[in-house]
């Protein structure tokens, strides 16, 4: 089962939920897709680290062979190429590495070179295999790294928890594409509702089964909860606002490994999610 | 000498467009013949890299200078490679800017922004 954890913005508790779920599951894989700011590994402190470079292919033109016909410039839908003063200019960050220009160049003047955009690090932390995508500073898109992360995760038959990037843009869409179930994490404020709405729209577009975890709940009114009730969204769990939990989390500790109370809470959540996800698959058929 | 201006409409009474890459039209004005030619900016509708394509169109038009309120990094790189100078417009009127340009009153554009990338998920 592949479970994606998402939220409309950072700091909502997405990492708290995904890290603790992965830690409480018997045998699991935690994948940090928040490639701009991966921090799951800070909690797990995985051992036996393995690193793998992630590269993309970039075209380069041989000036000896290029006749300046501009077939490639006109072909590139992303406008990553310009032909100026007898020279082909390639805009690395704009290029999507589709390879089209290479195919269409009548002179066979274009070849590809590799460019590193980040790396994937994996290691073991107790019962969890921890995989993190890390994008190099200055890169514009982490999508190729997320693609690679998910490609590798397809081989897994364990429970996989995807800690998605915040927001609802391309990188998040990429992350939830193959998820069996999505957990949306929301804060009990008016802003929290706004952020929740963003990811709610997204999972509906992708037609993913989903439920909400309300984080930092107090006794008072909870606009995020009201939103769920109004829209008949399943509330999977309400995590109370708790200084102890907050402190553990900000010290990089995994609550379920420290405290039986949280172990129980997240075990319950895992049970609920498994039931919901199974129910969804059953009603599909 | 030919100069290029991103504009909102294909008429000399139009105004300078606030966007460079996404301007609907590119005016190519010849300061010697006083002739004007409006190019459809084929880049305006593109998903990304609009500035690069618009810059390529301007280079291809033979313009040697551009009057624009702003310009993205990538487009600026294309224009620099082509040795096209960028000037900042003073107001919205096309004619006023052309006059100011002829009198050498426009200053060079130094505000090059990093561009609005649609991908990247930011
Ligand atoms: S590989 Fe694709 S995206 Fe990159 S420059 Fe060539 S055609 Fe454009
Ligand atoms: S298609 Fe090939 S020959 Fe034509 S401009 Fe591009 S690189 Fe040069």
Residue ranges and their predicted role:
Chain A
Residues 28-41, 114-119:
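Short beta-strand-centered segment that lines the nucleotide-binding/catalytic pocket of NTP-utilizing
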């Amino acid at each position: 089962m592949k479970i994606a954890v998402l939220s409309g913005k950072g700091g909502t508790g997405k990492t708290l939920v995904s890290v603790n779920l992965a830690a409480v599951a018997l045998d699991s894989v935690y994948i940090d897709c928040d490639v701009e700011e991966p921090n799951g590994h800070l909690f797990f402190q995985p051992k036996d680290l393995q690193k793998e470079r992630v590269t993309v292919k970039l075209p380069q033109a041989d000036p000896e062979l290029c006749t300046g016909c501009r077939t490639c410039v006109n072909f590139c839908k992303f406008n990553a190429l310009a032909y100026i003063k007898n020279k082909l200019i390639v805009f690395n960050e704009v290029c999507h590495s589709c390879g089209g220009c290479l195919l269409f160049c009548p002179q066979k003047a274009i070849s590809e070179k590799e460019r590193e955009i980040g790396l994937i690090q994996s290691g073991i932390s107790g019962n969890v295999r921890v995989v993190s995508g890390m994008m190099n500073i200055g890169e514009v898109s982490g999508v190729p790294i997320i693609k690679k992360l998910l490609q590798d995760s397809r081989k897994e038959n364990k429970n996989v928890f995807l800690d998605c990037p915040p927001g609802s843009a391309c990188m998040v869409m990429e992350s939830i594409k193959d998820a069996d179930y999505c957990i949306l994490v929301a804060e009990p404020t008016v802003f929290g509702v706004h952020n929740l709405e963003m990811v709610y729209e997204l999972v509906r577009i992708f037609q993913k089964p989903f439920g909400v975890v309300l984080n930092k709940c107090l006794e008072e009114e909870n606009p995020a909860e009201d939103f769920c009730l109004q829209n008949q969204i399943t509330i999977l769990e309400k995590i109370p606002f708790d200084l102890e939990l907050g402190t553990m989390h900000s010290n990089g500790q995994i609550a379920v490994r420290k405290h039986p109370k949280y172990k129980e809470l997240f075990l319950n959540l895992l049970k609920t999610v498994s039931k919901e996800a199974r129910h969804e698959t059953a009603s599909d058929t | 000498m030919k100069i290029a201006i991103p504009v909102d409409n294909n008429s000399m009474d139009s105004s300078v467009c606030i966007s460079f890459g996404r301007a609907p039209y590119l005016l190519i004005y010849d300061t010697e013949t006083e002739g004007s030619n409006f190019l459809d900016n084929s880049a305006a509708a593109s998903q990304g890299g609009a500035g690069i394509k618009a810059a390529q169109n301007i280079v291809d038009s033979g313009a040697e200078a551009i009057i624009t309120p702003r310009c993205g990094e990538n487009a600026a790189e294309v224009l620099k490679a082509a040795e096209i100078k960028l000037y900042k417009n003073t107001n919205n009127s096309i004619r006023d800017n052309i006059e100011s340009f002829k009198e050498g009153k426009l200053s060079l554009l130094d505000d090059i922004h990093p561009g609005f990338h649609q991908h990247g998920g930011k």
